Structures are given as C-alpha cells and as structure tokens.
Amino acid sequence: LKELKKIGKEYYVSGTAFHNYTNYPASYMSQLYNNHPDHEIIFTEHSEWGISGMYNIQKYFWNWSRSYMYWVTMTTYDLDEYNQGPYNTLSELSPTLLIENPDEPDKFYVTPEYYLLSHFSKFVRPGAYRISCDKGNIEEASFVAFRNCDGTIVLIGANQTNSLKNFTLEYQNKSSNSSIPPNSIGTYIWKE
C-alpha cells in the first residue's frame, strides 16, 4: 500500500483480506488500520469453534475486521469424502456449521458452530459497525459490541470459565446488571 500511495495509485486497492493459516496475531490487522485507516480489513476463510473460538472471532473485530467468514460451511458425513486435500491432516470430521445427513441428503445436522456464528449473523445486521466496549479478558468474560443501522446495540459475550460471570451493561448514563452462565456465549441487545 505504501508503494501504491507513493505513485498516487492507492485507489487500486480498497481492502485487504486476512487469513489465519499461519496463526499470526490479530493485532496485524490493527497495524494495517493504523497506517491506512481508510482501507477496509476483511477476515476470511478460517474456522473457529467452541467458546474459545468466540474469543478469537472477537479479537478479529477488535482489530478492525469488517467481517468474519467461516470456513467450511457444510461437509458430508461420509468419512471417505471429508477433509480431502493436501492441507487437511485431521483424522476426524473438520469443524463445520452443517453436516449432510447420510441417509437423507436433503437434510443436515446443525453443529454447535452454527449457533456460535449465529450470535453475529442473526443480531449484527448489514451496515452495523463495531463500537468501543470493555473487552474483558479470556480468563473471565470477553465482549465485543456493535451498533446496527436501526440504532440497536448488540453486545456479544463469551464466558470460558466454569463459573457464572456477572457484569454491568452501561450506556448513556444507564446501567443494567447481567451475567453469562459458565462455558457459554450470550448476546445482549438494547435500543438507544
């Protein structure tokens, strides 16, 4: 981007896609944002699962990603068909949102990852943007917040511990106490 900017051609690139194949820190996205705040950052092609996966997805958004694309969306249940390719070395079914029913190909099983991603896809609407909030931490509870175009605020929290985590929602001089059960994810929505 720096080289394109030097010659006045930065408009050739409107954004950068990040993939997590090498486990680089999500903070690399913030470094790019800090140098090019008008440049879109999009996180694509990665699979996160379980409550620990929610923490990673939150980190992508904390570091300026405008999206998160789950990969792989659907696989077959046939163990001879899944995980084909040189980079797939798992000896079990890879993480996926949906699994085809082997007896009825028009039907599928919904996995826990489907519900993990739906905290975002159901409540964070197109055009929403991330807003500042106390991020918490992985040892207690972690949070990311968005403002939808209709004025609703969405807070998505993850509790990876074995105990209930209490917290206080504070917004525009109003507050409400809430909690996240052990080993769970919660979505909290309110209107401005």
Q: Where do the language-model regions lie?
A:
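Substrate-binding and catalytic surfaces of secreted/luminal carbohydrate-active proteins
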Residues: L1-E192
